[in-house]
């Protein structure tokens, strides 16, 4: 499997999974080198956990099982039929059809497949139905053998080699054959409801037809759940070998009345678009205030966003209209390219240009060709967007495919348009239906678990449960408004399903849980005019943009401490002013633990707004929560945003804790728990010496950039301002409005959440000194701001570190 590195524990195993998945308590194996096998009800099963790592479980039944894994190296759980004692080729067994009904929740590198071996010759095979954050088997050393359509699904046929690796016959060299769905049947960090059948014999026939050796004797056919350095769970409700699902012959897509075969405005998520190469695709803002997708993490220029085209609809030699709208906000100008990847009649991969356009920074452009002819003999069609001369992140909206001459889905205005941002703006209240009952997503008049499930179905399968879905009881506009109970005004997300469940178990007292800034009816309407603000105490500076100078006199002694820092920028893009008694864009982490070296559970009662400030505290543990991998002794406080933020200036007003073994922090973070690489930028004050601050950052999990700076004051005695200006080619750290350090190498590029926490350490005495158990300890924060336009301090550019 893909060799990904899991550096930071996931924030939490999703509440959705814990509520919906398990109906029985499985036997759990803690950090043992497990290989358990058995038979039940005529089925063979196996659970395997490599290298004595993590926490795993499998609970087998007759034609069913549940499993879970966390913190593992490599894990698999499988169940099926063993044919080895018969020593026959697959053709002797007639049509082998495996039918499955599975709830599959991958959180990282994982896949669900039909799996097995043959002997004489030795061969390992996979028929992959769905995966998490990585499509197997990757591209290194992999040969392509075209595509095949079986059971109404199109699969790529691939071959890889394993040299001197473990097998059913000991350490051997052997091939692996793969059928991989061109579109995954699952999504990462989501509970996927997967019910289908796999005509296994037809895959064997397709491999043989493609020239792969299928002369061996069949060893087994199993349904397999596998994970590599990831977390996840599965509820395999049934496996059978009798078919039982009537799969109609596939038919080509018919164009709608406007000529579109496919149209995706991304209002309900990423649709069928996925990351290509290392790129990640996430729902974000789009053109003209709508939703779109954000493409990030491009480690090579050909990485981007891609979609597989149905070959029954899009035929070689015929002409179509293909396109999308794109925008980048990070370089002065780049060329976008729409490309068709295909396999020709000789089995060779080709890349044909559909359209190329130039886009200035912040400018939406139309990347479409209304008359593109698919090359003769082309199969395995993949349409993708790339930036050939740059690795910049970019935005997309309005992707479509239609008959020749069909107009683009979005008509790009010639006037200047503000680029979309991942942080919240202050939109006016949208038009549309008003709420009839908070949480009633399925509009049945009540609020229960079925509403949370319905939201997850809507997000996971918009073709069935979307506003125009095929299911009779699909989502309605009224249901979307009712169900939008977390950050109301931001649209339906998994967080809304979680909020409903929190309401049902009385973790929160009412719905909605929160409003998107500007959507709370108790607030007055605010302007959305973008203003660049220079904050000083004495001067006003005017540039070519509208520039004002604002002096904010901070109320004294919030939380009992003086304010000796610079004033808050009242015109920043995002402002969370805890002095008002409100959390702004933040929420408290509650009921989970990171793992080492964080010797605490995060609880919301350790993160409170009181006495004109946010107070993050370390105290004794409040509950009897247990974790088999890591059982911290204390409780800690953490505040984090729901939204992701990118380049710009981040600043907070903070008073730190003073005690050996503790940390007060302000940072941005994203990682595997967000389906992203580990990127992080830190400001940390170590309680052992509060006259210093530590700066640090991680890029794709690589750190070792620590820098200690002498403050010249004790940060535990008063509020001071701490900030960093994050740009594509540098990070500059600030203290009280003055730049004090700058880094220019291997700068992070993935948007992250803004976070603050207070925590005690364990096993890191050489870094923090040993924690003596003193509680309570409290760090105080007055406000946090983010300014998309970067730093505005008058001392910008000073760098005493050279």
Curated annotation (Swiss-Prot):
Keywords: Carbohydrate metabolism, Glycosidase, Hydrolase, Multifunctional enzyme, Polysaccharide degradation, Signal, Xylan degradation. It is an enzyme of class 3 (hydrolase). Its EC number is 3.2.1.8, 3.2.1.73. The active site is at residues 124, 226, 684. Pfam families: CBM_4_9 (PF02018), Glyco_hydro_11 (PF00457), Glyco_hydro_16 (PF00722). The keyword Signal applies. Residues 524-555 are annotated as: Linker. Residues 245-523 are annotated as: B. CDD domains: GH16_lichenase. Gene3D superfamilies: 2.60.120.180, 2.60.120.200, Dockerin domain, Galactose-binding domain-like. Transmembrane segments: none annotated. Residues 32-239 form the GH11 domain. Residues 434-513 form the Dockerin domain. Residues 556-792 form the GH16 domain. Residues 1-31 form the signal peptide. GO terms for molecular function: endo-1,4-beta-xylanase activity; licheninase activity. Residues 258-404 form the CBM-cenC domain. It catalyses: Endohydrolysis of (1->4)-beta-D-xylosidic linkages in xylans; Hydrolysis of (1->4)-beta-D-glucosidic linkages in beta-D-glucans containing (1->3)- and (1->4)-bonds. The keyword Signal applies. Contains two catalytic domains with xylanase and endo-beta-1,3-1,4 glucanase activities. In the N-terminal section; belongs to the glycosyl hydrolase 11 (cellulase G) family. In the C-terminal section; belongs to the glycosyl hydrolase 16 family. This is Xylanase/beta-glucanase. The lineage of its organism: Bacteria, Bacillati, Bacillota, Clostridia, Eubacteriales. The gene is xynD.
């Amino acid at each position: 499997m893909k060799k990904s590195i899991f550096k930071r524990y996931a924030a939490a195993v999703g509440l959705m999974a814990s509520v919906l998945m398990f109906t029985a308590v499985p036997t759990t194996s803690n950090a043992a080198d497990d290989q358990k096998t058995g038979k039940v009800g005529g089925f063979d099963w196996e659970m395997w956990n490599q290298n004595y790592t993590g926490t795993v479980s499998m609970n087998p039944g007759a034609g069913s099982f549940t499993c879970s894994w966390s913190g593992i190296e490599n894990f698999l759980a499988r169940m099926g039929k063993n044919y080895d004692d018969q020593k026959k080729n697959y053709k002797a067994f007639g049509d082998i059809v495996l039918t499955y009904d599975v709830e599959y929740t991958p959180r990282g590198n994982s896949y669900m497949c039909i799996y097995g071996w043959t002997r004489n010759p030795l061969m390992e095979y996979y028929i992959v139905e769905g995966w998490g954050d990585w499509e197997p088997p990757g591209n290194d050393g992999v040969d392509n053998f075209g595509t095949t359509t079986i059971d109404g699904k199109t699969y790529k046929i691939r071959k890889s080699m394993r040299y001197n690796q473990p097998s059913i016959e000991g350490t051997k060299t052997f091939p692996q054959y793969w059928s991989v769905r061109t579109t995954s049947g699952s999504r990462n960090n989501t509970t996927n409801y997967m019910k289908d059948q796999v005509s296994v014999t037809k895959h064997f026939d397709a491999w043989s037809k493609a020239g792969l050796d299928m002369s061996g004797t069949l060893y087994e056919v199993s349904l397999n759940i596998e994970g590599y350095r990831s977390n996840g769970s599965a509820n395999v409700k049934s496996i059978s070998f009798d078919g039982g699902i009537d799969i109609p012959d596939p038919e080509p897509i018919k164009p709608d009345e406007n000529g579109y075969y496919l149209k995706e405005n991304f209002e309900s998520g990423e649709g069928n678009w996925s990351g290509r190469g290392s790129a990640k695709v996430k729902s974000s803002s789009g053109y003209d205030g709508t939703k779109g997708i954000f493409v990030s993490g491009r480690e090579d220029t050909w990485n981007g966003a891609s979609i597989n085209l149905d070959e029954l609809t899009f035929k070689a030699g015929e002409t179509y209209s293909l396109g999308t709208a794109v925008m980048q906000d990070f370089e002065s100008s780049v060329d976008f390219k729409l490309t068709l990847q295909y396999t020709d009649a000789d089995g060779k991969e080709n890349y044909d240009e559909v359209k190329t356009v130039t886009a200035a920074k912040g400018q939406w452009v139309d990347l479409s060709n209304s008359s593109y002819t698919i090359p003769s003999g082309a199969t395995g069609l993949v349409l993708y967007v790339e930036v050939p001369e740059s690795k910049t992140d970019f935005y997309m909206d309005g992707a479509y495919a239609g008959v020749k001459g069909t107009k683009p889905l979005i008509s790009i205005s010639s006037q200047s348009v503000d680029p979309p941002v991942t942080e919240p703006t202050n939109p006016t209240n949208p038009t549309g239906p008003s709420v009839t009952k908070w949480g009633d997503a399925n509009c049945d008049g009540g609020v229960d678990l079925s509403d949370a499930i319905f939201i997850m179905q809507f997000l996971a399968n918009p073709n069935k449960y979307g506003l125009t879905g095929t299911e009779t009881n699909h989502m309605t506009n009224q249901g979307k408004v009712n169900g939008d109970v977390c950050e109301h005004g931001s649209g339906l997300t998994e967080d809304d399903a979680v909020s409903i469940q929190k309401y049902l178990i009385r973790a929160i007292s009412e719905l909605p849980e929160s409003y998107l800034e500007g959507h709370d009816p108790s607030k007055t309407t605010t302007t959305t005019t973008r203003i660049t603000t220079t904050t000083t105490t004495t001067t006003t500076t005017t540039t070519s943009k509208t520039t004002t100078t604002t002096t904010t006199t901070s109320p004294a002694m919030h939380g009992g401490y003086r304010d000796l820092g610079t004033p808050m920028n009242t015109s920043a893009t995002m402002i969370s002013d805890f002095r008002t008694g409100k959390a702004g864009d933040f929420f408290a982490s509650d009921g989970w633990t990171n793992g080492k070296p964080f010797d605490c559970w995060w609880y919301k009662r350790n993160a409170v707004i009181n006495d004109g400030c946010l107070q993050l505290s370390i105290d004794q543990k409040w509950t009897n929560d247990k974790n088999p991998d890591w059982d911290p002794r204390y409780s800690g406080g953490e505040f984090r945003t729901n939204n992701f933020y990118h380049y710009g200036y981040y600043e907070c007003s903070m008073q730190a804790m003073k005690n050996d073994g503790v940390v007060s922090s302000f940072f941005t973070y994203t990682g595997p728990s967000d389906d992203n690489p580990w990127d992080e930028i830190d400001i940390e004050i170590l309680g052992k010496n509060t006259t210093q601050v530590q700066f640090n950052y991680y890029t794709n999990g690589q750190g070792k950039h620590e820098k200690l700076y002498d403050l010249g004051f004790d940060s535990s005695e008063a509020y001071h301002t701490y900030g960093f200006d994050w740009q594509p080619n540098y990070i500059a750290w600030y203290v009280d409005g003055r730049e004090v350090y700058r880094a220019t190498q291997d700068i992070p590029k993935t948007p992250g959440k803004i976070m603050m926490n207070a925590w005690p350490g364990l096993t890191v005495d050489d870094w923090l000194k040993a924690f003596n158990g003193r509680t309570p300890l409290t760090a105080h924060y007055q406000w946090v701001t983010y300014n998309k336009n970067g730093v505005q301090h008058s001392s910008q550019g000073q760098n005493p570190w050279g």
